[in-house]
């Protein structure tokens, strides 16, 4: 059976496998994908929040508190819950096991962390705000520090192959838009790369990207609510 990915908005996705619904960085769900799934599904529901930025974290997720198995969040996320035992706060380097779900938090080059999740026999990586944040017009020292920090975080990755990787391709970076994702692909081989965090015009891979990674399978959602089946 294929797993299914639902694009919510920005960096928000639902990853559905045979037993679970994994919700990453829920911010908006304009097409009500989650509510629709929950009407007919008894699968275990997990929320993942990489950090507290408003485009990655919506406190409204607590309205599913009774339905959810767990809320797995970076420790900088503040969320008041009636069922505090369902809340699991992590920092980079932590590993958490809940049932058949194993979660490792890696670092970020902005706020919070990134998630490596093993569930249903698959390995899923969600980068959060981990990226090579090079900005035209910023001081050279700042951009050099951003480069150093990014490659330092990449060096920590022990998993060289994943089934699905969600990674930022931010339009605001202009010429540097692909620097982070291309460097990530030099370190890790995802069977499917999913573009996120566009912040503007939808990413169309450059000739350089396609020349370097001609065999890389991509999903670049076009609109909120888009759906992708993964290969078995």
Label for each model-derived stretch:
Residues 5-11, 85-95, 156, 173, ...:
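Binuclear metal-ion centers of metallo-dependent hydrolases, dominated by the metallo-beta-lactamase
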Residues 68-124, 215-232:
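Metallo-beta-lactamase
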Residues 11-16, 113-117:
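Short beta-strand scaffold segments in enzyme catalytic cores
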Residues 23-27, 43-55, 71-76, 125-128, ...:
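Active-site neighborhood of phospho(di)ester-bond hydrolases with catalytic His/Asp-centered motifs
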């Amino acid at each position: 059976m294929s797993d299914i990915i639902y694009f919510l908005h920005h960096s928000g996705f639902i990853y559905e496998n045979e037993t679970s619904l994994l919700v990453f960085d829920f911010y908006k769900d304009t097409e009500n994908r989650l509510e629709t799934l929950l009407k007919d599904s008894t699968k275990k529901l997990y929320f993942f929040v990489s950090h507290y930025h408003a485009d990655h974290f919506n406190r409204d997720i607590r309205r599913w508190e009774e339905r959810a198995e767990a809320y797995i969040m970076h420790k900088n996320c503040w969320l008041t819950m009636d069922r505090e035992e369902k809340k699991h706060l992590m920092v980079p380097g932590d590993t958490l096991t809940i049932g058949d779900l194993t979660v490792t938090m890696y670092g970020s080059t902005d706020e919070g962390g990134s998630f490596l999740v093993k569930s249903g026999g698959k390995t899923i990586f969600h980068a959060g705000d981990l990226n090579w944040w090079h900005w035209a017009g910023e001081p050279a020292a700042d951009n050099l520090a951003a480069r150093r920090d990014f490659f330092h975080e990449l060096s920590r990755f022990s998993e060289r192959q994943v089934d699905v990787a969600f990674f930022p391709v931010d339009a605001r970076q202009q010429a540097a838009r692909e620097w982070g994702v291309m460097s990530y692909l030099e370190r890790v081989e995802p069977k499917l790369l999913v573009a996120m965090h566009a912040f503007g015009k939808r990413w169309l891979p450059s000739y350089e990207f396609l020349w370097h990674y001609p065999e890389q399978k991509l999903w670049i959602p076009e609109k909120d609510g888009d759906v992708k089946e993964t290969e078995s």
